[in-house]
């Protein structure tokens, strides 16, 4: 079952290397054979080559997880771990973009397209051995996902015209979900994206209103219960996270061998992506999902020696982008505006943002940082998404003259000949640009963006900061002016992006959680995203989402930079590797199927 819910610490010490050195030579006590635990009826059968059980996979993790909770988590260092711990009603095959059975063995849909019925497998178990039933599905939806006291990125997209779905239990193995109207991406989102959570573990946290801290990094690992292929055995902050096979996992291969094949997966925490690459190249880890284009030549040369296989899945869904803080609200704690009013006036002007986009020399970024292995990107959807990409959006090739002309139209020009632009009130155009430390490519892109904008006449203060602090600025404090991050990797269906595009979205980053759209174009985005959600006609959905892309490229609330080619690497003796550019986890999206051939 492939889950799609699927965003800084010191380098581990020699003592930890003794624990995490070679994945195939484990000194941990062997796990109880998976066959000794009862299987669900019927078990899920993986469509893969039967492999060899055993061994330990070693990988590196950039940054510390903030949580092991898939409902409240919203960044990659956490997702890297919790994606292994939980399962959904359905699975999702990334290369083919097809849903498949999961915890549910079957499902049906009514003729009007609004009533969905899921039949769970008999004798499903949580990772602690407790039964998994329809009560857990009901609890997940009614007590967690739709709980107004629990902030989560999923809820934004799980409505029709603002109305929630009705989720009811038919019997212990049957759940019925009724949508207020046709909901086009039902199977991809409801079925494959919503992780089912254990009522027997988390009901008290929901009742006590402490769910936000449930499954936190301070929880005892044995109490973090899920139904995915692995469970947490041990967590040492700033050092490693040791996962062990979930003996109750519901999937087997064609020979009847229970998945996953690996006994353990260990993630050693590293401070940056360079350290991640060094660990792989030195043989201290056995998989690297995040190889950057500028590393390609070195990895290609090393792979020729036969120690590992370099994977080249192609252009993916991820892109770099930066945006300005357009939040018009007042901080209730201070009584002050989140954004300096004079700067807010600049940031909320589309011509200001268009000028910034014209100022960026994307070809220089591609050549100097990505070694030519990237393409310019001007829109929300990358060319890697062949199904939904709109090639007719407005583009912004590097043109400082156009940028200056646009700024002059809104009263921004060099008024005193000092080389710095001022607005109509004489305020110098100056702001801080943040990105996360540890991603050297992104930091280099930020330096080039700063340089390009300064050539335009802005003063830009570049301040890289810790990733978790950056997330807090985006999600909670809104204490920033301009941010550069990556975007993408969450799937291709338009409805998976409602939380970003719709104005009330949890991750509508430039101005999140609006009670009412703050602009006419955001209101139009809301309408279009709701409209495409309510029809099963692909052509109608494509038309609506094409317009969404056109609005975003015209209004540029996010200024996109480049989309890199994707690369990954695995040790040469790893089986069932099916690399894809359509997942952030290019080589390990199907980790339960991976195994060592010898």
Provide a role label for each language-model segment.
Residues 41-44, 57-111, 142, 225:
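N-terminal lobe/hinge region of extracytoplasmic solute-binding protein
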């Amino acid at each position: 079952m492939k889950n799609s819910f699927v965003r800084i610490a010191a380098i581990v010490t020699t003592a930890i290397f003794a624990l995490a050195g070679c994945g195939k030579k484990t000194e941990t006590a062997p796990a109880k054979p998976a066959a000794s635990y009862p299987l669900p009826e019927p078990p899920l059968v993986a469509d893969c080559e039967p492999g060899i059980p055993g061994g330990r996979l070693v990988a590196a993790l950039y940054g510390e997880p903030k949580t092991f909770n898939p409902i409240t988590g919203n960044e990659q260092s956490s997702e890297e771990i919790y994606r292994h711990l939980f399962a959904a009603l359905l699975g999702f095959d990334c290369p083919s973009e097809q849903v498949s059975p999961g915890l549910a063995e079957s499902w049906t849909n009514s003729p009007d397209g609004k009533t969905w019925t899921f039949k769970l497998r008999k004798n499903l178990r949580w990772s602690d051995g407790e039964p998994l039933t329809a009560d857990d599905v009901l609890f997940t939806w009614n007590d967690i996902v739709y709980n107004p006291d629990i902030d989560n990125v999923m809820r934004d997209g799980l409505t029709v015209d603002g109305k929630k779905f009705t989720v009811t239990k038919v019997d212990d193995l049957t759940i019925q979900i009724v949508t207020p109207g046709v909901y086009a991406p039902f199977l991809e989102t409801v079925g494959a994206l919503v992780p089912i959570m254990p009522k027997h573990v988390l009901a008290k946290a929901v009742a006590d209103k402490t769910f936000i801290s449930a499954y936190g990094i301070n929880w005892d690992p044995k109490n973090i219960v899920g139904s995915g292929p692995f469970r947490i055995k041990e967590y040492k902050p700033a050092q490693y996270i040791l996962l062990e096979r979930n003996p109750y996992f519901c999937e087997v291969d064609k020979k009847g061998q229970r998945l996953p094949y690996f006994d353990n997966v260990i993630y050693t925490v590293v401070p940056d992506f360079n350290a991640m690459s060094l660990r792989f190249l030195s043989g201290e880890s056995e998989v690297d999902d995040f190889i950057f284009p500028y590393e390609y030549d070195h990895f290609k040369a090393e792979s020729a020696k036969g120690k590992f296989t370099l994977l080249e899945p192609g252009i993916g869904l991820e892109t770099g982008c930066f945006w300005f803080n357009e939040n018009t609200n007042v901080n209730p704690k201070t009584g002050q505006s989140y954004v300096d009013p004079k700067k807010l006036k600049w940031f909320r002007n589309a011509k200001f943002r268009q000028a910034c986009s014209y100022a960026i020399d994307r070809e220089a970024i591609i050549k100097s940082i990505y070694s030519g292995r990237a393409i310019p990107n001007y829109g929300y959807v990358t060319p890697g998404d062949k199904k939904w990409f709109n090639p007719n959006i407005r583009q912004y090739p590097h043109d400082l003259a156009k940028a200056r002309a646009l700024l002059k139209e809104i009263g921004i020009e060099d008024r005193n000949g000092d080389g710095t632009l001022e607005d109509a009130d004489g305020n110098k155009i100056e702001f801080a640009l943040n990105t996360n430390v540890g991603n050297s490519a992104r930091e280099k892109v930020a330096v080039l963006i700063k340089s390009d904008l300064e050539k335009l006449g802005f003063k830009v203060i570049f301040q890289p900061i810790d990733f978790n602090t950056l997330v807090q600025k985006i999600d909670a404090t809104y204490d920033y002016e301009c941010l550069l991050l990556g975007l993408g990797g969450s799937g291709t269906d338009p409805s998976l992006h409602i939380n970003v595009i719709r104005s009330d979205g949890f991750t509508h980053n430039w101005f999140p959680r609006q009670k009412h759209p703050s602009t006419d174009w955001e209101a139009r985005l809301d309408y279009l995203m709701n409209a495409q959600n309510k029809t099963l006609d692909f052509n109608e959905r494509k038309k609506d989402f094409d317009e969404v892309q056109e609005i975003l490229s015209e209004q540029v609330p996010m200024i996109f930079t480049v989309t890199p080619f994707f690369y990954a690497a695995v040790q040469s003796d790893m089986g069932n590797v099916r690399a894809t550019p359509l997942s952030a986890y290019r080589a390990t999206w199907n980790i339960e199927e991976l195994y060592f051939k010898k």
